Regions:
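Generic structural detector for well-ordered beta-strands
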Residues: 19-21, 97
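Residue-level signal for short segments within beta-strands and strand-turn junctions
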Residues: 5-8, 46
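NAD(P)H dinucleotide-binding glycine-rich loop of Rossmann-like/cofactor-binding domains
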Residues: 79-104
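Glycine-rich beta-strand-centered segment in the early N-terminal region that forms part
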Residues: 21-36, 46-87
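Conserved catalytic-core motifs of eukaryotic protein kinase domains, centered on the activation segment
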Residues: 42-44, 90-91
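Residue-level marker for the onset of beta-strands and adjacent loop->beta junctions
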Residues: 16-18, 52, 92
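Extreme N-terminal starter segment of soluble prokaryotic enzymes
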Residues: 1-2
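Short N-terminal binding/cap micro-motifs at the start of the first secondary-structure element
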Residues: 10-17, 39-41, 74
Length: 104
């Protein structure tokens, strides 16, 4: 599984693609189909949102398809909205684990 992450604040050149561990049992796993890129993500990457500390994966919303987990059938299309990027990786990933309250 790959994710876009930054380890220091800065311009777009601080973004890198890295491998991350697979999600644990009991988590809803969503294969991302689209993730927003917006001014909020730019502010996070530049260090203007003090609550987000590196290393961090940007992305506060997106949509995808459930591929594993509890609560929804596999293949269900879902929209994900925050608090991604605050204490958990954002939506700029191939796969996102989502808490029950973070999905529609």
């Amino acid at each position: 599984m790959r994710t876009v992450r930054f380890d220091v604040y800065g311009d777009y050149d601080v973004l890198k693609v890295v491998e991350v561990p697979e999600p644990g049992p009991g988590e809803l796993l969503v294969q991302m189909r689209a993730a927003a890129v917006n001014p909020f993500d730019d502010s996070v990457r530049r260090g203007r949102i003090a609550e987000v500390k590196p290393p961090a994966t940007p992305g506060n919303e997106g949509m995808g398809v459930v591929v594993a987990g509890d609560g929804l059938p596999i293949g269900t299309r879902v929209m994900l909205v925050g608090p991604f990027g605050f204490g958990r990786p954002g939506t700029w990933q191939e796969y996102v684990t989502a808490a029950e309250m973070a999905r529609f």
